[in-house]
């Protein structure tokens, strides 16, 4: 419940900051073109790891919550995308903003999601990525530079999405 109030406040704040160019949407947000800072991500159903350990390959970061309908809607397409490119052309990870770890873990188990997921209870990644509404998917190049941010549910394994990902990363998929 508290998370929803924070998200509502974030939406209202976003409306205000969109009127003033150059302002970030969340405290400490890395804008498109900026390089993500290194943080330790707390693993869900897997080990914790540093964000920097994923450098060297293009990275797709999906910010989600178990209570978010659009997040759940697109999660299957992210799973299929991660399986399709399992051999290392790109990495796909999820960042849960759930207040309660057990809810996120239960959702992952029940939905059969196998790509690496982490929890962000201290809002470090949520703020750095600018996740003032969900879902948010961030495309990050091999050096950690933010290439694009997409809000809202998307069919990430569709031909159109794969072509868009390939264009951003300048790779052939």
Give the residues covered by each predicted segment.
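N-terminal export signals
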Residues: 4-24
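N-terminal "domain-start" segment that seeds a small globular fold
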Residues: 23-51
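Short loop/turn microsegments at loop-to-beta-strand junctions
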Residues: 37, 59, 134-136
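Short, ordered coil/turn segments that flank beta-strands lining enzyme active or ligand-binding pockets
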Residues: 44, 54, 142
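Short active-site neighborhood of thiol/selenol oxidoreductases, capturing the structured segment around
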Residues: 52-67
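Structural microenvironment flanking redox-active thiols in thiol-disulfide oxidoreductases
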Residues: 72-111, 121-128
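Thiol/disulfide oxidoreductase modules built on the thioredoxin-like
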Residues: 109-113, 121-164
């Amino acid at each position: 419940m508290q998370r929803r109030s924070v998200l509502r406040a974030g939406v209202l704040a976003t409306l205000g900051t969109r009127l003033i160019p150059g302002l970030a949407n969340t405290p400490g947000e890395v804008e498109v073109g900026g390089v993500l800072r290194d943080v330790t991500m707390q693993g869900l159903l897997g080990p914790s790891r540093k964000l920097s350990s994923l450098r060297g390959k293009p990275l797709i970061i999906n910010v989600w919550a178990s209570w978010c309908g659009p997040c759940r809607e697109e999660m299957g397409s992210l799973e299929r995308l991660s399986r399709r490119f399992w051999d290392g052309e790109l990495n796909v990870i999820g960042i849960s903003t759930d207040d309660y770890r057990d809810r996120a873990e239960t959702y992952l188990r029940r939905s059969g999601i196998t790509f690496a997921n982490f929890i962000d209870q201290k809002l470090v990644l949520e703020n750095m990525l600018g996740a003032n509404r969900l879902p948010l998917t961030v495309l990050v190049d091999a050096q950690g530079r933010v290439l694009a941010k997409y809000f809202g549910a998307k069919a990430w394994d569709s031909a159109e999405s794969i072509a868009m990902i390939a264009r951003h990363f300048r790779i052939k998929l």
